[in-house]
Amino acid sequence: MADETAPKSSKPTAEAAPKKTGYTNPALRAMGIRQLRLPSRNWMIFWTVVGTISGGIYYDRHERKKVRQQYKDAVAYLGERPLGGLEIPRKITVFVAPPPGDYLDHVLTHFRAYIKPILTAAALDFEVKQESRQGEIRYVVAEGIRNYRREQMGLPKVPSRLMVDEEEYNKAVAEQNAEVERLKAGREKHTNPNPTFQAFNSINNRPGAPSSPDSQPEEQMSISVAGTIAQEQLDKEITSKLEFNPESGVICVGRGAYKEYLAGLHEGWLGPLEDPRPDEDNRKVYEEFPNREKDDDDALGLVKTPVEEPTTAVQNVQSVSEHLNSHPEMVKDVSETISHSGDVTAVTDVEQTAAGPVDVVSETASTHDTPAASDNKTPKPLSEMSPSEWDPKAPLPEIKRKPVPKPYIRPEEYSEAELSEFYASGFENASTAHSTVSSNINQQPNDLNSPAGSGTAFVEQFFFSPIAVIPHRHIMGFMNTPLRIARYFNKRAVADEVGAATVVAVTGDTRPFDVKTDPDLLVSEEYDWPSKWVKKGQDNGSEWVQPVVVDQRVMEKVKVYQPKGEGESELK
């Protein structure tokens, strides 16, 4: 009764909120599809971000393909032109260098994505010359020019010091010096530059064969000479009918490769044929800056402090041996203890130690191969090892890369150096061969000494070719993350810029090199280089951070590609 008489509350009870019905459709409901509702706020944010990023990447990739296809179609007519069986396509030499503080893979990816498709569509032959250490491009260009000068002087070529051992290089230099002395003495000797003759000559000079044709019987010598002359005439006839295209070209990808290429031109035409530094300076290790891992870590402040190595086992054994020699009474106790364990070899070793000092290093090295002994012992090459001696778990000996030779001439010495006498004649022969072949490609001279026939030699001599500079902008650093993200979503602009520059190198005109403006091509890329890397380069005298010094005499006949109908290059 008390409950019935209790006064009711005047406040109304809160009713439950009605459930959202969402989108209902009888047809969907008949198919068993649940009610469709809008996602929650958090899911809306998530899908918006994912959709925006995915859409941006897809749109940029789609536009990039369109731009690439546009430039491929612009040069496709060159690839569709019929090529004769004896016609050699035009060759382009591409120089690539890793970006500062990073690896070579980035610039190679840049080449394969934006440059290679256009060269392939134009059916051009191209050779990529890449460097892993600073200075290699400069040395390759300079050494190519020096070998050309040696060839014009009648001297043998010297192999690249990056590809041969120091002994082989010194041997080649000695042979060249001997040839110079022979020419000075006025003696004449028949030298055949034919590769086939040189190959057969190397076979005849093998161990067990006569060292020279003079030591052969007269019949064998006559047969050898007749066969050589016939092979030489055949090669000459085939070469005379080949349709070489002397209109080659050079592409420098990035500011660093361009600076090294210009330095190589000056070193080759103005520098001496041989390294002016003494031999002891050449044997010193050249600083591999900046594209070695240790230099990258140093430039980025990631170098770890060296940790002191623990005492080696040999030093421990030596200290024990000295202690036993100074306390003979301990040897007897140790011998008795070991004799109870049955180790007779250990007793003998201890007794020998008590008798006198033992060469612990040699004995330990023979049984345990300690680090101290293995460092002093030169490892035997795998080719000289027998199957029983070879240990597959043993570490291979470290292969040290040959150092990059330093420049033969410094930039401040350009003005005082004398230009090579073969500079003007080389460019004139190259231009004459190009004009003759372009005017009548089907008419080939029979005489290889004529200017047009000499164009065959200029296919490999890229340093006479016009230059095209293609940008490669690469930025690093955490503070540059917003700029890196913006560039990532705008790679279509890179494809447009690089594609236009590549098409200019394939189909564009040429103009003389401008010593006032052209040295600053792609100078804006230097602002993207890491500041720590640049500072270290300035301290170590890096070639990349030095200002570009050009000589009017060297760049007088050098050409630069430009778009057709334009007076100035836009690649700045």
From Swiss-Prot:
Among Pfam families, the record links this protein to:
Tim54
Top-level lineage group? Eukaryota
Question: According to its UniProt record, where is this protein mainly located?
Answer: mitochondrion
Task: Give the membrane topology.
Answer: Single-pass membrane protein
Q: Where in the cell is it found?
A: Mitochondrion inner membrane
Which InterPro entries does the protein's record reference? Answer: Lipid_Phosphate_FormReg, Mt_import_IM_translocase_Tim54
Residues spanning the membrane: 43-59
Q: Which residues lie on this side of the membrane: Mitochondrial intermembrane?
A: 60-572
Region Disordered, annotated ranges: 1-21, 185-221, 363-404
Task: Output the Gene Ontology cellular-component terms.
Answer: cytoplasm; intracellular membrane-bounded organelle; membrane; mitochondrial inner membrane
Task: List the Mitochondrial matrix topological domains.
Answer: 1-42
**Which keywords fit this entry according to its UniProt record?**
Membrane, Mitochondrion, Mitochondrion inner membrane, Protein transport, Translocation, Transmembrane, Transmembrane helix, Transport
Which family does the record claim for this protein? Belongs to the TIM54 family.
Q: How does it assemble?
A: Component of the TIM22 complex, whose core is composed of TIM22 and TIM54, associated with the 70 kDa heterohexamer composed of TIM9 and TIM10 (or TIM8 and TIM13).
**Protein's name in the database:** Mitochondrial import inner membrane translocase subunit TIM54
